């Protein structure tokens, strides 16, 4: 239900852009396409993992969600740089921020679904501890796999200029 709420918000942002004839720069469009591809990948992996009861697939969602967060931060930073250069407007920034927030929240909910699926299968439900161990665990198999996937997703979702979100 929450994911669909954010989908409606994205639709409303698109309608606002159409009504106000807001068109992002080519660079912003290309950056958003990278983000949208990563969000779509996150949604597909989450729904497939849930539908199939596939814990291995569910474990691939969290590193992808982390990359989406990095992409959102990088797009915001790049927008600020365009604002400072005078090649973008504040009004565009409000719409962009709405889009980014909703994409990020969709992926947050996907992460919640995948982590809950894993935790229930392990007869546990300490999500914060699980995520902390995953991201900062010392030489655990799960943590190592998380970081391998994180690096792979960073390479997959490069900006058109060849930079990863982490490099921004």
Where are these regions (language model features)?
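Cytosolic, long alpha-helical scaffolding segments
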Residues: 1-168
């Amino acid at each position: 239900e929450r994911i669909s709420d954010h989908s409606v918000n994205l639709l409303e942002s698109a309608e606002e852009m159409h009504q106000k004839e807001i068109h992002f720069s080519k660079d912003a469009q290309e950056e958003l396409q990278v983000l949208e591809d990563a969000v779509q990948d996150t949604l597909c992996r989450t729904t497939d993992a849930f539908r199939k009861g596939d814990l291995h697939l569910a474990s691939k969602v969290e590193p992808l969600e982390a990359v989406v967060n990095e992409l959102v931060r990088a797009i915001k930073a790049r927008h600020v740089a365009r604002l400072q250069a005078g090649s973008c407007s504040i009004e565009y920034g409000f719409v962009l921020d709405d889009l980014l927030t909703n994409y990020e929240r969709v992926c947050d909910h996907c992460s919640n679904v995948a982590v809950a699926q894993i935790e229930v299968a392990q007869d546990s439900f300490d999500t914060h501890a699980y995520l902390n161990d995953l991201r900062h665990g010392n030489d655990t198999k799960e943590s190592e796999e998380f970081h391998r996937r994180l690096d792979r997703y960073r390479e997959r979702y490069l900006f058109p200029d060849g930079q990863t979100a982490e490099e921004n």
